Amino acid sequence: MNQTMKLTFVNVGYGEAMILECPDPRYRGGNFVMVIDGGSAEPGEFEDSVSGRLPFSEYLRTYGPDHIDLMICTHIHEDHLCGLLPAAELNTPSAFWQTLSSDFYASMPPLDGRPVKTASQDKFLRALRDYRSLCHSLAAHGTVLRTLRAGEIISLCEGLTCRVLAPAALRTDELQRDLRSLLDEQADDAFIEKLTALDARMNNYSLMLMLEYQ
């Protein structure tokens, strides 16, 4: 059991993956464990072992922690989201926070076989597929899916408070509208155009959190 809050930034290469552990006797092992993003799932991202980078799930398997109370996806990009899928298969989180409506994934098609022309388009399409797969898997295992909105203040554990700074409801509605337009598009050229445009804007819809620990 940790005696104070511990924040770990895992070397997953270009993307992001963070683990926050906070002492609280109400949780397993006396620690509340929160994961924010999971880095990439591309094997090529980890070929350079000299840098010390490794897949997020491998880090969890080797160094722990042995459970996840809360998993957060800041936005749907390959180098932030796709590493969460194997991490969740290793340790299913009790709760999952993200920006889309908690049931949006259920209406998403598989997206298998949709066309791409560039590596960037392929990465974004895989991120969308993995988001869908992740949410389906989490829901099937009883994880509580929650949508965050700017202005919320949430107590996470003893002494730790989370303030949601972004996105605003207007931004989330815009994201869902544009994503629905993309998913419903049948013409290949128009699909690729919408895919590229949404990929370029996705960072604008990211979760922004301020954590306060006392």
Give each language-model segment a name:
Residues A17, H80-L81:
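Short, well-ordered alpha-helical microsegments
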Residues G64, T74, A95:
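Soluble catalytic regions of membrane-associated enzymes that act on cell-envelope
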Residues S40-P43, E78, R171:
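Short acidic, S/G/P-rich loop/turn micro-motifs used as interaction or catalytic elements
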Residues N2-M5, L81-Q214:
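Flexible, acidic/histidine-containing loops and adjacent segments that form or flank the divalent-metal
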Residues N2-D66, M202-Q214:
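Conserved beta-strand hairpin/beta-sheet module of binuclear metal-dependent hydrolase folds
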Residues I68-D79:
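Metallo-beta-lactamase
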Residues P23, I36-G39, T74-I76, L148-G151, ...:
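Active-site-proximal beta-strand/loop segments in catalytic clefts of secreted hydrolases
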